[in-house]
């Protein structure tokens, strides 16, 4: 982005995740970057700035429903870090302003259908202005993308590559994440935007390599065909990891993001796979301890069956954290994530790796 008054402005800074992101940025990088904070509530914003030792002049009150005010704030910085969700409700004005003004943008959304729509609407504008719009930069889907990329690099050209991930996690959900989940259940998603390759089709590679033109179309690498790995969406005991397992709750997000990244890398010539499959499961306990498996199965079935009903969402909202709330600091510090990933190609080559992070996966490890 062009020379601006700030390098980074954190939008949604007074939310649960926003506060943590702002604190980390200011503590670690304020000597190297000019950092500002933006949020809707002036009093809470000034209180946060005081806690972090940030001058009041570096704080900006902004309501994302006010498009003109959003443009003013976006125009002050080279990069917007948005933690203000649900993004389907509050995010479009920010993305639109960044795309138009050439301001780089990143967020921690897991709303695939929303980002697909945003890419369709604003990718061309972002390419023209020089803005880079980068989503899914939290727990969904940074660990998955890192692991898949590291494993895929070990393989040469293959007819097929299958990668399967197993998550062991300990952590809590904050109110913003739950609000996003409830909003997603309420909307039911947008059926035309939930295909496994939706982010590939929507992106058209604008943010990575520019549009495919008539001049280079004949030499463009063929993108991998998506296949369903054996054992995807499995409920039961998995011999490979000797654990009970269910589908991972964020697999619907991560699989689509991973396929987009895989396709982009293949477009750039990094990989050469004709078919590619990716799936995610939760790792929930040894054979003699099925309790967490049973509880997780019941939870997933309950959300699937009752989630579309307004009365259930209203009831559920009484028992979960509200936006701005989240796990205690002690709980966050005690959290962890371990990701075991297995890859197998059609030629018989097998590879695996393990990623591990200390701290709550959503509220420390990836913030």
Task: List the predicted regions and their residue ranges.
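Structural motif
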Residues: 7, 78-79, 104
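Conserved beta-strand positions in the Rossmann-like core of class I SAM-dependent methyltransferases
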Residues: 33-36
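N-terminal Rossmann-fold cofactor-binding loop
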Residues: 38-42, 63-64
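Short, conserved SAM-binding/catalytic segment
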Residues: 48-55
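Conserved Rossmann-fold cofactor-binding substructure of NAD(P)-dependent oxidoreductases
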Residues: 60-79, 83-89
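C-terminal catalytic/substrate-binding lobe primarily of soluble NAD(P)-dependent oxidoreductases
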Residues: 153-367
